[in-house]
Every structure is written in structure tokens, then in C-alpha cells.
């Protein structure tokens, strides 16, 4: 009898989730939403290296509540900075005593772009205000290149101001979620477009869908052409050139791995997996020794692993009447935390730094090494963390 009652309750619950009569689910406004399998490697194959000392808890928190969502951090060719893009669409410059407005990407800025109390409040107007993500300086002329999530690849001169468009489409397909970039010695720009369907404001839907419309692209300043180098990717994110310029490393965010794309030599035009990651990667930056710092947004967990391999179960779960915030907390294992990993060119783990409980540093988006310090930005936090390397 008890089993019969439980079966009926489950049936009613399943029907409720299937039709979502009160539009309580996180995908209720997207009737055509689809989920796909993510070929995430087994947990047993992941790197075993961990930072049991939680060394990132020794970081210094700077500029608390002075910068909202500083995704990327850059220093100009003279070593000045940092520069960072924030949630209201501006690129800010630290002049040594205070933050000043350096540049912006949108020419449609209005009062909608004024500072807001919460980072989430900016999402609905990001397409109007712009949302700068990856930042890179051209070391030859001091131009700053910007990966704006909505406007594509932008460029602004050393004096700052309104950035101009470099490219916003490839192969007739608009850039929908421009994410990170790097520039070689000839001025070619390599960059990621995380999705051809979802814009940044719907990044959680992109993560949970597993769709594979992401691309890695190249802009040639001489021909003004943008070409696709790698396609059919699940949330490509960070990208950084190798020290000698013969390859770049990019990350596949949903799968959680690093791939090397060869630009020169007998392997030119091909790519290969060089590392499986502890979790879900964001930006990548190369240090002066040619090693790569990868910002890992969060560790993998059993929940994310199971959801990756069973898309129908994932979609059913998404139809539950629970908030996007709760969905996010499940993805990150219950609480935001911080992981930064240094890799060699061959994909060998050289160093792991963590704040596993998020006591000081959380949700790292980028790790920039400069003068013995790691500068860490976060698209979800309102500070920059600085860690002194031993």
C-alpha cells in the first residue's frame, strides 16, 4: 500500500515536472531547450595533485567592492596596471592610487549601465552596455584587444576611449559569446566563441545543455578575414599562445580539458588533448617561462559527472521548481571555491593552488603571473586577489 502511494506521488511529481504548469523551472521560458551528452572523462582519470594546504587562503584581497566582476587582468607593455573589464561594460585602469575609466566597448551606453548593487543586476542590459571578458595588449603598439561577449573582438588605442570593432562574425555566423583571445607577433588574433546559440547572460543554460556550437577562430589583420580553426566544441573558453608562438592552448569548458592547436611545423592545423583538468576551466595565461596558468572555476563532483553522461536525467532535473542559483551551487559542489593550476607546454601539472572552502578566494576566472605575484580575477566576485609566489 505504501509503495502504491509513493508510486502515485512520483507519477504526479513527474507529470508536474514534464508540463511545469506554473513556469517555476529554470528552463520554463525555453520550450525548445535540449540537452546533450558531455563526454566527460571518468573521475578516476583526473589528476591526483591537490593543494591540501589551501595556499590561496594566503592571498590578499584588493579593491574590494571597487571592481564588479573583473574577469580578465592585463598589464600594458610598460608594465602599468592592472587593467580589467567589469560588469557595467567599462575597462578600468589602476593608476597607482585609484581606478580610472580607460575604455568601453559599446556606443549605446546610458543610465542602464550605471553601477548596480548586484552583479546579477547587470545581465539583462549587457548587450546594451557591453561585457568585456578577455583582455590582451599588443606589445608592439600598445593597442588593447578586448573580447566583448556580445560585440565580438574590439580594439582601443593606448589612450583608451571608445573601442572599435575588429570582427563580429565568421563564415556568415555572428559571434554570440566571444570569450578569450591572444595575439601573435604578426598581429593575428586567436579567440574563442563559446556558443553560436547562447549569449553570456544565459551561460548557465549553455553549461547544462552541453551543446557543441562553440568555435576557435583566427582574425587576420592583413586580409581582414576571420576563419574558423576548430568547430563543434562544448563551451570553449580560455586561450593562450605558447612562448615560441608555434601553438596555442585552449580549454574545453564543459568537458574540462586542455587542447593544443599547432600553428607551425608538421602538425600545423591539427589539435590534440594535452591535459584533463581537475574541474571546469576558464581563462589561460602564459608566464615568462612558457608555462600556463589555468583558472579552474570549480572542481568536478559526482553530481556534475552523472549529469554529463545522462542528458535526459539532466533535463528532468532542470524542470524541477528550483532556482538557477541552487542549480549553480550543485554544479560547484555546494559552495564557490578557488583552484589555479600551472601546466607545462606538454600538459604536465607543475603546481596546484586552492582555497577549497572559498574562505578567501572564490570562482577564479583568470590567473595572471607578474613579478612573482599571481593576480586573480573573477567574473562573479567584486575584488581582485593577489597571491605571492614563494
Curated annotation (Swiss-Prot):
The keyword Glycoprotein applies. Glycans are attached at residues 95, 108. Residues 1-25 form the signal peptide. It is found in: Vacuole. Its main location: other. SUPFAM superfamilies: Calcium-dependent phosphotriesterase. One of its GO terms (cellular component) is endoplasmic reticulum. Keywords: Glycoprotein, Signal, Vacuole. Coiled coil: none annotated. It comes from the Eukaryota. Gene3D superfamilies: TolB, C-terminal domain. Pfam families: SSL_N, Str_synth. Belongs to the strictosidine synthase family. This is Protein STRICTOSIDINE SYNTHASE-LIKE 3. The gene is SSL3.
Amino acid at each position: 500500500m505504501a509503495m502504491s502511494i509513493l508510486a502515485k506521488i512520483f507519477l504526479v511529481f513527474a507529470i508536474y515536472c514534464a508540463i511545469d504548469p506554473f513556469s517555476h523551472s529554470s528552463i520554463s521560458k525555453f520550450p525548445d531547450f535540449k540537452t546533450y551528452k558531455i563526454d566527460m572523462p571518468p573521475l578516476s582519470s583526473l589528476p591526483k595533485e591537490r593543494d591540501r594546504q589551501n595556499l590561496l587562503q594566503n592571498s590578499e584581497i584588493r579593491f574590494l567592492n571597487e571592481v564588479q566582476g573583473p574577469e580578465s587582468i592585463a598589464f600594458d607593455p610598460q608594465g602599468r596596471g592592472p587593467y580589467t573589464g567589469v560588469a557595467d561594460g567599462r575597462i578600468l585602469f589602476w593608476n597607482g592610487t585609484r581606478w580610472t575609466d580607460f575604455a568601453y566597448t559599446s556606443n549605446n551606453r546610458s543610465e542602464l549601465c550605471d553601477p548596480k548593487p548586484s552583479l546579477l543586476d547587470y545581465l539583462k542590459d549587457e548587450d546594451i552596455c557591453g561585457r568585456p571578458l578577455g583582455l590582451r595588449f599588443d606589445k608592439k603598439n600598445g593597442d588593447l584587444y578586448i573580447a566583448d561577449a556580445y560585440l565580438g573582438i574590439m580594439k582601443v588605442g593606448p589612450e583608451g576611449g571608445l573601442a572599435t570593432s575588429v570582427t563580429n562574425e565568421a563564415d556568415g555566423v555572428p559571434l554570440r559569446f566571444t570569450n578569450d583571445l591572444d595575439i601573435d607577433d604578426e598581429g593575428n588574433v586567436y579567440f574563442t566563441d563559446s556558443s553560436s546559440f547562447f549569449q553570456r547572460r544565459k551561460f548557465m543554460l549553455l553549461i547544462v545543455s552541453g551543446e557543441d556550437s562553440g568555435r576557435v577562430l583566427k582574425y587576420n589583420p592583413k586580409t581582414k578575414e576571420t576563419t574558423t580553426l576548430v568547430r563543434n566544441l562544448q563551451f570553449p573558453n580560455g586561450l593562450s599562445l605558447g612562448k615560441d608562438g608555434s601553438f596555442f592552448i585552449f580549454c574545453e569548458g564543459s568537458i574540462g580539458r586542455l587542447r593544443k592547436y599547432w600553428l607551425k611545423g608538421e602538425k600545423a592545423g591539427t589539435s590534440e588533448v594535452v591535459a584533463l583538468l581537475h574541474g571546469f576551466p576558464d581563462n589561460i595565461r602564459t608566464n615568462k617561462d612558457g608555462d600556463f596558468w589555468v583558472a579552474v572555476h570549480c572542481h568536478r563532483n559526482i553530481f556534475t559527472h552523472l549529469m554529463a553522461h545522462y542528458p535526459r536525467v539532466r533535463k528532468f532535473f532542470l524542470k524541477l521548481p528550483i532556482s538557477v542559483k541552487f542549480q549553480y551551487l550543485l554544479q560547484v559542489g555546494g559552495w564557490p571555491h578557488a583552484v589555479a593550476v600551472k601546466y607545462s607546454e606538454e600538459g604536465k601539472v607543475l603546481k596546484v593552488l586552492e582555497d577549497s572552502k572559498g574562505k578567501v578566494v572564490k570562482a577564479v576566472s583568470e590567473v595572471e603571473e607578474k613579478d612573482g605575484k599571481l593576480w586573480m580575477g573573477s567574473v562573479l566576485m567584486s575584488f581582485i586577489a593577489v597571491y605571492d609566489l614563494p
